[in-house]
Amino acid sequence: MQIAVPKEIKNHEYRVALTPTGARELVGRGHTVTVQAGAGEGAGFADAAYEAAGARLEADVARVWEGAELILKVKEPQAEEVARLKAGQTLFTYLHLAAEETLTRGLMESGATCIAYETITDRQGGLPLLAPMSTVAGRMAIQAGAHSLEKAQGGAGVLLPGVPGVAPAKVAVIGGGVVGENAARMALGLGAEVTVLDKSIPRLETLDDRYQGRMKTVFSTADAIDEAVRECDLIVGAVLIPGAAAPKLITREMLAEMKPGSVLVDVAIDQGGCFETSRATTHTDPTYIVDGIVHYCVANMPGAVARTSTQALTNATLPFVIALADKGWQQALADDPHFLPGLNVHDGRVTYQAVADAFGLESVDPASLVK
């Protein structure tokens, strides 16, 4: 199969969809891998490393896309990339379509087959291709939040762990999944006072057992969120409804109850954000202030630590990439019921129910396309 790895073009996105090690695996199975020149440089992978792995280098971006049967990316395609997609091609990347109607319709118009990393499941009901980047984003959320609390960044001038004689900052994490646990773990490690809110009692029990009561666990209700809003210096939004838009859990009215200079970090921004006042930002201009509250809403947080993120991503995606390359998308998805939910768009039709519901579109059962 002809496999293409274009260079990411989203603002400050330095990750690449495939490491040289991954390219070597695919070439060894008889596939042709074409990597856009410079695609791996931001993650510390030189062109020469891809050549040594047997991949072809191509400087012309148009040629990278034109001859591809399978296109591997990291972030959702930007407008100029959507324009390059065509029927007969398979795109495998993070899509987060439920918050992006223009992108969804663009992919439909392309006629391509679009498979999303973030909606593939596993036997335990987890999201195996979202988990590694969620781990990175959760840990980075606390770094970003701690920095945003500095006075020069618009924050209250609070040091997360405090100092002897001065209380540490209070941190609330809304959502106790992979992002939430990693955010809470980082905040705890830095010495903050940490509360995790979640609607799953079994999940809260797991966190209680794992951290031996060193962080507070609270069943998430409107009242519990109100209390966090009033008391906390830093709130991390880590809520996920797989494939669907995130719920708005903190309204603009609630910002008035927060301490001036407090910080909101919205890790759910890829899915539209879980704060009413959230809007996507970039690594170039990561924060803004609404009603005295600092908002950090960078949509590709792991892109800032591209080498770690790229290695973790390839470790997770490579088995699925191999299946697509060896079998073609239909057989690969037919053989694996956990791979099947990854199909979001095919031949002009939406195949993931939550995306269809978000925009009032009809959804096609993906199982009907792979029989």
Locate each region found by the language model.
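Residue-level detector of alpha-helix initiation sites
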Residues: 76, 136, 177-178
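Glycine/serine-rich phosphate-binding loop and adjoining beta1-alpha1 elements at the start
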Residues: 2, 8, 79-169, 298-300
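Glycine-rich phosphate/diphosphate-binding loop of Rossmann-like nucleotide-binding domains
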Residues: 6-45, 152-240, 287
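Short glycine-/small-residue-rich Rossmann-like dinucleotide-binding loops
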Residues: 69, 75-76, 95-96, 221, ...
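An N-terminal-biased, well-structured beta-alpha scaffold segment characteristic
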Residues: 2-106, 110
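Rossmann-like adenosine-cofactor binding region
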Residues: 209-291
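Adenosine-phosphate binding glycine-rich loop
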Residues: 118-159, 269, 274-371
